[in-house]
C-alpha cells in the first residue's frame, strides 16, 4: 500500500520506539486496563516503525484547526495517543467494540456504575471528600449537560471532537455574601425603610394644594427593576490583595530600612570607641584627673557617672576617648601636678582636651546616646568656667533635647534603644544613672536660665522620675525607693522586698539639693520673668505668691531628715562618707533662697499700704541668711572642705553685697559682724576665680560696690534708699558679660565687642548708610587709623613709662599727681566729694574720685584693658598691695587709709575697667537698725 495516499490522516507518535510504554501511560491515566486490551495497537506499532523514520511526524496536520480536522484536539492528551476506530481505518484491521470509547481512553459504558470519577479523589476546603464536580467545561455549561470533569478533555468533548476548555477564574469559590455581613446589614435596611415610609407621610401632608404638581420621585422610593447584587469587599478585592502581597519585593535602597540605620549606628558606636585616642593624655594623668573630677565636680555641680564603674573601665581601657577627654578637661583646673601645669590660668588648662571632645560631640549631634549626652553636660560646665557664655548656652540646649530624645524623663524598666524589638531590662545602677543624667539637665537648665531674657525649658511636671538615692546606696548597688519632686512615691516599698520603708531616709544630699534648686527656679520665674507683676495680691498678703514661695523655703528646710540637718556631728559623718562639700552646698542653697526672697521684698518699700513689720522681718531674714552663708564658708575652710560648685560662689557674692551695707551701719555689733564675714567671703571669691573665670567680674563688682557706697556716704546720700533699689546682679548676667569668652592668650578685655559680620543682618531691613544732621552732631565720629605703625611703636613707650613710674618709691600724693587729668566738670565737684578711695569715712582730703575715674581712659581705649577677668594676678606689679583687695578692705581698719590715697592702677581698675553702673548691685533688700 502506498503511504502517499494517506495525506489527510495524522497519526500521533509515529516515531515512538516502544508502543507498550504508551499503552501503559494510557492505562495509568484513565482506564487502568491491561495492555492486552489493545492488540491492534501493537500491530499498528510495527507498521509505523517500518513506514516512517524514527522521531518524524507528518506536518500537514499542524496547520489544521482542531474543529476542521479529525485528528484529536490535543497531542498531549491521552486521547491523541490512540488510533482512529474501524470506520475511518483504511488498513482494514479488525477491531472489537471500537465505538464504546475504550480506544479513546475512557471507561466503557457498562462499567460506568462501577468506576469512580476522575475528580472523586479531590478534597474540599473543609477537608471532606468532594461529591460534586467542582467546575464544568465551557461546552458542557453551554449545553446544560453533566460534565465528566476529566482534564484536559471531558468525555463529551472527546466524543464530539470539540475542544474542551475549562474557564480559569481567580475568584475563590464561596458564598456571594457573608452570612454575618448580611445580618449586620439587616438593621440598616430596616432603618432605611422606616425613613422612607416617614418621608412619604410627610409629603402627603405637605401636598394639600389641589393643583397638580409634577415632581420626580424621591430617590429610593421607587423599587429598581434590576436587582443589585454586590460582592463583599473580601470577595471582590481578596484575590488581588493576596496576589499583591505575594509579589516579590523590589531591591531596597541602601540605608532605607531600620536594620541598615542600626548598622550605621553600630558603626558610629565603634568609631566613637576609637575617635580621639591620639589626644588622650597618659594613663597616670587620666587616673589623677578622674579622682579630681569625682572630688570637685561630681556631686557638687552635677551628679554624673558611677565612680566604681568609671574607674574600672578607665584602668581596662574600655571607656570612649571622648568621655575621658571631657573629664580631663573640666578637672584640669583643680590640679597642681607639674605634669598638667602650664603657663595658662587654671580655668583654661583643659581647653586643649575640651576642643577635641567638643569636635567629636558636634559631629554626632544626630545620633543621641548617653555618652555624648554626658559629655555635653560636662562640656557645658567647662565652657561656663571659661567665660564662653554662648557656647555653654548652646551645649545645654542640645543636651536637653538629646535627653528627651532618649526618654530619660521617664522611669523605664527596659532599654528603649533595644534592637529588633528586644527588651533589655535595666539594672538598678543603669536606671539610677539615667535618672541622674536627667536631673543634671534639670539643674543645668536652672543655672543657665537665671536671667530675664533666658527662660527655662524643662518644666517640673514633665520629669516623671524619682529623686536620686543616697550616695552610698548608689555606689554599693543597693536599690531603694525615693520620692518624686512633688513628694509622691512612684514605687512604694513592700515588706517582701527587704528595702527601707521610709523613702525620705533613702534620699540623700542630691535629692534635697535638687529640690532647693527647683524652688530657686520658681522664685526666679516669679521675681525676674514677669510673674510678680501678674500677682493680684501684694507681697505682704498671705494669699500672694511671694508668701507661698517663702513658706515653701521654710518648709523645705524643716523637712530635712535628722541626718541632713546642719551640725558639726553631721558634717563629720559626711566627711567619712566623702560628701562634705555636697552637704555644705545644699545648706548654702537653702540659705541663699531665704536671702534672695527677703532681699526682693525691699523693692516694694514705697508702695501704698505696706506694713512696717513686713520689712523689718524681711531685713532680719536677709541679714541672718547672709551671716549664715559666711559661717558655712568659714566652717568649710576650717574643716578642710572646699565647695567648688560655681553656684556656691554666687551664694557668697549675694552674701557679700549685704555685708557691704552692714559695714556702713551705725550698729557696732552689726558692723563688726559684717567686717568679719566680708573678709571670709572675699577670700573665698578670690579662691573661686582661679577655677571659674566669671568670678573675676564678680570680685571687681564687689570692689566697685564697696567704693561706691563710701562715695555715696561722703556725698551725703541716703544709704537706706540705695539699699532698697530693686535691681541687683544676677547669676546669669555673665552670659551677656562674656558672650564669646576670652579672645586670645594675652587676655584681651572681654568687654570689647567682636566686630559684627557684614552679612549677619542680611535678612533684615536695609539700613541707610547716610546719617542725618542730628546724628552727625550727636554720634561720635568713627576714628580712622592712618598710620598703624606709629601707634604700635607708641604702645611700648607707654608701657616702659608705666614701669618706670611703678618702680619709683611711693610718696604721699605722688601717684595722684602723676595720673590726674582733671576736666573742668571734675574740678567743680572737688569740694562736694571731699573723700577719696581711702577707707576713712571723714577727714580725707586731697583726692578727687571723679578725677580718678577719668584718668588715662584714652590710653586704654585703644589697648588692652588693665583688668581682665582672665588675669590671675592683676596686682602682681605692686609689691606693697594685697593680692585680693587693698589691705584696708580686708583688715576693716577704718582709722587708717594710707593718707586717703590708693594706688593709681587700683583707681583705674575700679573706675575705668567696666562701663557699667555698679550702684544698682548694692545689696538691696536690707533696712538698717539705727
From Swiss-Prot:
Coiled coil: none annotated. It is found in: Nucleus. Gene3D superfamilies: Zn(2)-C6 fungal-type DNA-binding domain (4.10.240.10). The keyword Ribonucleoprotein does not apply. Its main location: nucleus. Pfam families: Fungal_trans, Zn_clus. Induction: Exclusively expressed during infection of common bean. One of its GO terms (biological process) is DNA-templated transcription. Keywords: DNA-binding, Metal-binding, Nucleus, Transcription, Transcription regulation, Virulence, Zinc. GO terms for cellular component: nucleus. GO terms for molecular function: DNA binding; DNA-binding transcription factor activity, RNA polymerase II-specific; zinc ion binding. It comes from the Eukaryota. The keyword Transcription regulation applies. InterPro entries: TF_fung, Transcription_factor_dom_fun, Zn2-C6_fun-type_DNA-bd_sf, Zn2Cys6_DnaBD. Residues 137-164 bind DNA. Zn(2)-C6 fungal-type transcription factor that has a role in the establishment of the fungus within the plant and/or the progress of the disease. Regulates the expression of virulence factors such as SIX1 and SIX6. Multiple copies of the gene are present in highly virulent fusarium oxysporum strains. This is Zn(2)-C6 fungal-type transcription factor FTF1c. It comes from Fusarium oxysporum f. sp. lycopersici (strain 4287 / CBS 123668 / FGSC 9935 / NRRL 34936). The gene is FTF1c.
